[in-house]
């Protein structure tokens, strides 16, 4: 018998009818499973991706299920800021006066080619971090009072600090380093967003999570041949999850009552997990936040009136240390 992500997450009996959720990168992998789960729970789901045929298939699957869920598909290339803005606009229209209840920042991947986007930013960093940052910033005023922002990160975030000078160059490019840097940015972004919202007495929460190593997602399509072949065998190992299992933590953070007031934290397997020391550094989180606005050429979101970023208490502490290597797609 198939076990759905919402059942694994312990929220299979919840109903979130009249709520709206955006799941980016939801035409395959854990994004698709997350979108289907939220649809089964009754939400109106904005499905996002670049493959229109795959997107329509997810919409049909949600609307064909025996529940009250509905869906629509919006195509957007996350390497293009204008398309991210169009996705934000379409989501705003879908949410209406009730606001957006759930934002799952899941789109991303592992890209082995050294290249810059049209904005002059290293491609992996732009797609995996800068576009989720932009999308979230553009939707801040459209979030419901108790909305939840969930960002797919990875245990792959553990590594060197982010060198801001590397973000606009591809000299000595390393695909793994680019991926690791983008995943560290995901954890730092989620923590900083949580802090800035909390400093404004907002009930909106922001958390990140590690989904597990998932060969069934689209992560491995960009790996070099030998690595891709080796990765394909990971699905036979017991510590590697399926897309449905990987989606369970996203669904848990989006729906479960017990985390309604939890913000700025990092999760794995539906439990808080301590991220890297660098990921917890509030100064590094603040620098990334400010640099991201500069790279996009926009005003700093949620900037304090006096120009400061608020308190310096670190987010993401606590939890267990188990979990396998992760990816987002």
Explain the meaning of each model-derived region.
Residues 2-218, 298, 302-308, 321, ...:
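Rossmann-fold NAD(P)H-dependent dehydrogenase/reductase core
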Residues 21, 263-266, 273-329:
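C-terminal helix-and-tail extensions that cap enzymatic domains
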Residues 24, 171, 175, 232-236, ...:
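A short, mixed-charge helix-start or loop-turn motif at secondary-structure junctions
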Residues 27, 85-88, 243-254, 282-289, ...:
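Short, amphipathic alpha-helical "lid/cap" segments that border enzyme active or binding sites
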Residues 60-63, 224-225, 258:
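A generic structural signal for secondary-structure junctions
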Residues 182, 208, 232-273, 282-283:
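C-terminal helical subdomain
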Residues 215-232:
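A glycine/serine/threonine-rich, flexible loop-to-helix segment
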